[in-house]
Design a protein with these regions (language model features):
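ATP-binding pocket architecture of kinase catalytic cores
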Residues: 1-50
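Protein kinase-like catalytic core scaffold
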Residues: 12, 103, 121-124
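Generic structural signal for conserved hydrophobic packing positions in ordered secondary structure
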Residues: 12-14, 42, 105, 140, ...
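An alpha-helical support segment within catalytic cores of ATP-dependent transferases
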Residues: 48-51, 65-107, 117
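Short, conserved phosphate-binding/catalytic loop or strand-edge motifs used
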Residues: 56-67
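Catalytic activation segment of kinase domains across protein kinase-like and atypical kinase folds
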Residues: 113-139
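Active-site activation/catalytic loop segments of kinase-like enzymes and analogous catalytic loops
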Residues: 136-170, 184-189
Length: 189
């Protein structure tokens, strides 16, 4: 904040990170493995971090299905599809949600927020505004959902990302089983 005689001005200083957004490069398995590793390392670094805003009602937290359900009236065209994925989540994940790993996650590793270097390695991630205390498996699921949405044959790519993440930040078998449902819910938000 810069105080002037007749005004108060807010200034934000940013560091420019050179590279290309993931959306602008053709992903391969090795590249997405490194993205998964990066996300896993980020989540490991966030262990023990606390913030009062991390536990809030938040539409972008796909694990908060009550928020998604409250918004169904705004999704008339896709309502039945969204309800289908909500039911899958309830049937396959919600019943054992207390067994799933939780922590503060970045929660927005989409292809517009991941910056790659010229060698196909992740350089950085931006946009920390969607951070939330949620299911750990949601971290790779968010990125995997955007990869799957933009690729004709995504399975090898998203498997590589999940492998990179889980080798860095271990996920339980139940966590791993929840990933596909969390991917689908993220696309419903």
């Amino acid at each position: 904040v810069i105080e002037c005689p007749n005004s108060r001005n807010y200034v934000r200083l940013l560091t420019y990170i050179e590279g290309d957004f993931l959306k602008d490069v053709k992903p391969n398995s090795a590249m997405l493995f490194s993205v998964g590793e990066f996300l896993g390392n980020l989540d490991k670094a966030l262990i023990g971090f606390e913030h009062k805003s991390s536990s809030r009602e938040f539409i972008w937290d796909a694990a908060q299905i009550h928020v998604l359900i409250s918004q169904l009236d705004h999704s008339k065209n896709d309502r039945s599809l969204i309800e289908y994925f909500i039911e899958l989540y309830k049937d396959n994940v919600f019943g054992h949600i207390n067994e799933l790993s939780k922590g503060i996650i970045h929660n927005d590793g989409n292809d517009h927020n991941v910056i790659m270097d010229q060698n196909g390695k992740i350089k950085s991630i931006i946009d920390f505004g969607d951070m939330v205390f949620s299911l750990q498996a949601l971290e790779p699921a968010v990125c995997m959902a955007y990869i799957a949405m933009n690729e004709e044959a995504p399975f090898e790519l998203i498997a590589s990302l999940l492998k990179g993440y889980s080798l860095t930040k271990a996920l339980s078998e139940k966590d791993l089983e929840s990933v596909v449902y969390l991917m689908c819910l993220r696309m419903c938000v």
